[in-house]
C-alpha cells in the first residue's frame, strides 16, 4: 500500500501499516515511509478495518443565530431605493439586477427526451449576487419577493427562490402596479405564494424560443453561412416587413383624376369649392386626361342648383388610456422614440424619480400591460382634477369605459397612467430629463383626456346637382366641420403616421351657409382637374408594425420591444428614418424559413400558440403538453430541412486588389448588415473596409468621385462620395444624376414618385424630370 511522502515528494510504500479511525470517525492507514522513515498516512477503508470498532463521534451543535428582520428582493437598484424608502426600518431591500438563472448558452439546455426539462445555471456575473442574497435570506425572519407583476417578474421570483435556496415556508410574493407608498403598503398587507402557472407560461415561452432558435440556426450556418439565425416570434415580424417590401416593389401606380369646382350662390358674394362625387349616379372613373377633358367640356355647359343643405353635429371620443402597444405607437409617432427607448424611459418613470419634498416617487403605473382598467382611487382623483381645472362641462356624468383590445388581457392590471394626476408635467419638469419629461407628459395627457367629454364638431354638407344639355347629371359635394366644443382636445390629440390622413372634412367656415338654400341656382366659376396616381402601401414603422402584431395576436406587452430590437440588431431590418426596410440578409433568412418552416412564420399558427401560452398562465393547459404538441411536427421539419435544403454557400469573390497590410487578396464577405471587404488571410490579418456600392451618379460636390451607398455603425443607409475623406459629400436620401431645373442643385429621391432639391427644397415628379432629361 502506498501513501504520499511529503519529504520524498512522491508516493512510497507504507512500512508497518496500522489501520484505525481518526477523531472524525474516518478510516485511515498510518505508518512510516519505507525510504526515509517519515510518518505517512492514507485515507480510505481497507480490509484491515473490518472488525475494528468505529469510534463514537460527538459533534458539537453549531450555534444558530436567531433570524430577524425582513428581506425584500426586487429587480433593480432604482426600484430597491424607492421601495426601501416606503418600507422603512426593519426591512432590507436588495436588487437581483434582472434574472439570476437562465438556460446555458453553449448548448440547447432542454432535455427533449425528459419532458423538455430545462437546464438552468447561474451566470458567472450573477454568482456573487446570488451568494449575497442566499446569505441575507438565511438570516431573515421573512422574505418578500417583490419583482414585477407579470409572467417575467413571477419567473424571476421563482428563479431567485431556487438559485438562492430560499426557504419557501418563510417566503412571500408581493405585487404592486405602481411604486407609491399606498400601493406598496397594500401589497405587503396581502402577500401570496408564487403563482406557478405564470412561471410555467414564461418557462414554456423560453423553451419554445430556444427549441426554434437552436434548431433552425445551425442548419442555416451549415447550408448558407455563419451568423444567420432564426427565432420563433421575430421571424413573423420579419416576414411582415419583407412581404410589405415586395408589395412596394411589385406595385404599379395607376393614373386617376379628380375634379373640383368653384361655385357662387345666386345673389351671393363668396364662392366655395365642391368636389365631383357622382356622374349619373356612379362614382367617377377618370383614368386619363382625355376622358377628363370631355367631362370638363360637358360640365361647363351644365346648369347647377342646390339639391340639399344639411347641418349636424359630430362627436369625437377620446382614445383609451395607454397600454404597452399604444404607448409604443404614440411615442414613435409623436416623439420619434423606438419601442426599446420608450420602454427604457417608462421603466425609469415607473421605478421612481427624486422629487423635492417627496423623496423618490414612482411617477407611472407598470408599463407592460394590455388592460385599460383604472383603479377607483385614480378615477376619483382624476375626475376631481378635471372638474377643478377645466370645469364641469368637460367632465362626463359617468366615467368613460374602454374595451380591452385583447382577450388575454390580465384584468388585475391597470392601464399605463400617472400615479397621481396632481403631479402635472410642468410642475415636475425640473426633476426629469428631457426624454423623461416628454414621455411623462404624453402619458399624463392621454390619461386625463381619456376621462373627459368628447369634442363636438358642427358639420355642414351641401350637395349641388348640375344637369347638362347632353342629359348628364353631375353631383358635387362640399362638406366641412368646425370645432364647437373642444372637450378632451384641450389636453391631447392622438398622433398619426406620416401616411395616415385626418378623418376630417374641410373647414365649414369656407362655405357661405347663410347664402345657400335648397333649389337655389349656383354659378360655375371655375373647374379644377387634378391628376393623381395610386400609391403603394407604406413601409412599416415601428408603430405600425407593433399595431399589426397586436391586432394579429402576435407577442405580448413584454415582447413587442424585444421583437423589434432583435430583427434590427441581427441586421435583418434597417431603420430608414422611421421606416423599416429589410436587408439582403433579411430577405434570404425569411425566404428560407418560409419555405422550410412555414408554420413558424404563419400568423395564425403563432397567434394560436400565444393563446396556448395564455392558457398555461391561467391554469387551463399544461406547459409540457403544449411544447410536446409543437415539437413533434417541428422536429420533422428540422430533419427535412437538414436533408433537403440546398447548400447556398457563395464562392469567395475577389475584389481585384491586394490587402494594404499583408499583400494577400481582398475578398467580399457577408456580415450582419450585408457585404464588406476583408483580407483573405483572416484571421492572421484582420484588415477590413466597407463594401462601396456605386449607384451610377457622379459626386455633385467634387465631380470626381462616385456616389456610393454606405452604412452607419447602427446599420442605417446613407450616401457619400467614394473619395471620402478627401470629399465630405453625404446625404440620407439617394441622389440622382439630373439637376434641379430651378437652381441646378442636387436632386434626391424623396419617395416613389417625387424628387426633392437639397438646395431650394422644391419637389418635382420623377417622371417629368426624367422625360426632360431624355428629351435633352
Regions flagged by a language model, labelled:
Residues 2, 23-24, 39, 43-71, ...:
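Basic, low-complexity terminal or inter-domain segments flanking catalytic cores
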Residues 53-206, 215, 286-287, 293, ...:
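Intrinsically disordered, low-complexity regulatory segments
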Residues 68-69, 148-149, 225-229, 311-320, ...:
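Conserved short loop/turn motifs at secondary-structure junctions
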Residues 179-261, 312:
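C-terminal or mid-to-C-terminal helical accessory/interaction module adjacent to the motor/catalytic core
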Residues 205-215, 233, 263-265, 314-326, ...:
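Core structural elements
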Residues 283-320, 520:
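Metal- or metallocofactor-binding catalytic centers and their adjacent structured scaffolds
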Residues 306-309, 318-331, 358-366, 536-548:
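Short acidic, hydrophobic short linear motifs in intrinsically disordered regions
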Amino acid at each position: 500500500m502506498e501513501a504520499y511522502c511529503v519529504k520524498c515528494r512522491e508516493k512510497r510504500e507504507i512500512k508497518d501499516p496500522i489501520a484505525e479511525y481518526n477523531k472524525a470517525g474516518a478510516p485511515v492507514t498510518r505508518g512510516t515511509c519505507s525510504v526515509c522513515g517519515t510518518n505517512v498516512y492514507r485515507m480510505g477503508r481497507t480490509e484491515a478495518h473490518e472488525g475494528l470498532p468505529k469510534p463514537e463521534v460527538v459533534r458539537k451543535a453549531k450555534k444558530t443565530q436567531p433570524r430577524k428582520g425582513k428581506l425584500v428582493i426586487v429587480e433593480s437598484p432604482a426600484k430597491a431605493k424607492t421601495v426601501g424608502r416606503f418600507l422603512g426600518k426593519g426591512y432590507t431591500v436588495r436588487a437581483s439586477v434582472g434574472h439570476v438563472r437562465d438556460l446555458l448558452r453553449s448548448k440547447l439546455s432542454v432535455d427533449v427526451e425528459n419532458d423538455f426539462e430545462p437546464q438552468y445555471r447561474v451566470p458567472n456575473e450573477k454568482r456573487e449576487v446570488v451568494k449575497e442574497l442566499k446569505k441575507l435570506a438565511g438570516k431573515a425572519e421573512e422574505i418578500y419577493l417583490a419583482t414585477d407583476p407579470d409572467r417575467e417578474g413571477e419567473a424571476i421570483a421563482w428563479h431567485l427562490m431556487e438559485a438562492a435556496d430560499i426557504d419557501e415556508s418563510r417566503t412571500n410574493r408581493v405585487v404592486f402596479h405602481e411604486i407609491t407608498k399606498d400601493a406598496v403598503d397594500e401589497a405587503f398587507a396581502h402577500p401570496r405564494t408564487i403563482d406557478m402557472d405564470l412561471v410555467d407560461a414564461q418557462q414554456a415561452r423560453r423553451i419554445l424560443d430556444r427549441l426554434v432558435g437552436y434548431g433552425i440556426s445551425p442548419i442555416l450556418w451549415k447550408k448558407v453561412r455563419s451568423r444567420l439565425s432564426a427565432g420563433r416570434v421575430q421571424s413573423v415580424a420579419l416576414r411582415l416587413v419583407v412581404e410589405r417590401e415586395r408589395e412596394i416593389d411589385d406595385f404599379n401606380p395607376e393614373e386617376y383624376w379628380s375634379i373640383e369646382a368653384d361655385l357662387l350662390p345666386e345673389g351671393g358674394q363668396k364662392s366655395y369649392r365642391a368636389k365631383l362625387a357622382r356622374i349619373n349616379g356612379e362614382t367617377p372613373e377618370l383614368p386619363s386626361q382625355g376622358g377628363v377633358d370631355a367631362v370638363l367640356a360637358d360640365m361647363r355647359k351644365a346648369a347647377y342648383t342646390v339639391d340639399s343643405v344639411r347641418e349636424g353635429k359630430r362627436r369625437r371620443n377620446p382614445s383609451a388610456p395607454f397600454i404597452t402597444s399604444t404607448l409604443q405607437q404614440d411615442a414613435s409617432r409623436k416623439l420619434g422614440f423606438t419601442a426599446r427607448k420608450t420602454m427604457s424611459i417608462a421603466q425609469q418613470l415607473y421605478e421612481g424619480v427624486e422629487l423635492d419634498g417627496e423623496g423618490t416617487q414612482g411617477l407611472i403605473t407598470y408599463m407592460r400591460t394590455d388592460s385599460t382598467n383604472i383603479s377607483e382611487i385614480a378615477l376619483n382623483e382624476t375626475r376631481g382634477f378635471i372638474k377643478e381645472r377645466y370645469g364641469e362641462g368637460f367632465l362626463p356624468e359617468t366615467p368613460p369605459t374602454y374595451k380591452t383590445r385583447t382577450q388575454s388581457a390580465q384584468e388585475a392590471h391597470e392601464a399605463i397612467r400617472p400615479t397621481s394626476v396632481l403631479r402635472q408635467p410642468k410642475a415636475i419638469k425640473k426633476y426629469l430629463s428631457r426624454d423623461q419629461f416628454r414621455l411623462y407628459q404624453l402619458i399624463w395627457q392621454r390619461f386625463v383626456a381619456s376621462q373627459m367629454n368628447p369634442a363636438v364638431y358642427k358639420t355642414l354638407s351641401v350637395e349641388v346637382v348640375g344637369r347638362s344639355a347632353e342629359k348628364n347629371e353631375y353631383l358635387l359635394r362640399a362638406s366641412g366641420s368646425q370645432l364647437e366644443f373642444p372637450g378632451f382636445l384641450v389636453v391631447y390629440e392622438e398622433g398619426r403616421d406620416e401616411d395616415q390622413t385626418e378623418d376630417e372634412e374641410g373647414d365649414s367656415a369656407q362655405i357661405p351657409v347663410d347664402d345657400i338654400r335648397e333649389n337655389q341656382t349656383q354659378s360655375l366659376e371655375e373647374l379644377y382637374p387634378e391628376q393623381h396616381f395610386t400609391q403603394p402601401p407604406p413601409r412599416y414603422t415601428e408603430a405600425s408594425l407593433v399595431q399589426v402584431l397586436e391586432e394579429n395576436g402576435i407577442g405580448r406587452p413584454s415582447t413587442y420591444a424585444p421583437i423589434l430590437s432583435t430583427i434590427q440588431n441581427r441586421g435583418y431590418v434597417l431603420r430608414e428614418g422611421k421606416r423599416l426596410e429589410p436587408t439582403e440578409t433579411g430577405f434570404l433568412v425569411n425566404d428560407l424559413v418560409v419555405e422550410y418552416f412555414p408554420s413558424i412564420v404563419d400568423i395564425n399558427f403563432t397567434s394560436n400558440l400565444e393563446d396556448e401560452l395564455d392558457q398555461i398562465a391561467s391554469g387551463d393547459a399544461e406547459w409540457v403538453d403544449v411544447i410536446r404538441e409543437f415539437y413533434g411536427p417541428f422536429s420533422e421539419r428540422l430533419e427535412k430541412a437538414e436533408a433537403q435544403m440546398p447548400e447556398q454557400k457563395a464562392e469567395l469573390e475577389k475584389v481585384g486588389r491586394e490587402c494594404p497590410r499583408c499583400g494577400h487578396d481582398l475578398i467580399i464577405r457577408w456580415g450582419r448588415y450585408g457585404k464588406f471587404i476583408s483580407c483573405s488571410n483572416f484571421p492572421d490579418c484582420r484588415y477590413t473596409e466597407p463594401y462601396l456600392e456605386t449607384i451610377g451618379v457622379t459626386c455633385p460636390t467634387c465631380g470626381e468621385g462616385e456616389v456610393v451607398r454606405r452604412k452607419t455603425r447602427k446599420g442605417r443607409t446613407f450616401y457619400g462620395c467614394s473619395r471620402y475623406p478627401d470629399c465630405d459629400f453625404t446625404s440620407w436620401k439617394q441622389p440622382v444624376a439630373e439637376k434641379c431645373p430651378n437652381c441646378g442643385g442636387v436632386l434626391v429621391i424623396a419617395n416613389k414618385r417625387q424628387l426633392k432639391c437639397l438646395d431650394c427644397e422644391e419637389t418635382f415628379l420623377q417622371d417629368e424630370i426624367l422625360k426632360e432629361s431624355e428629351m435633352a
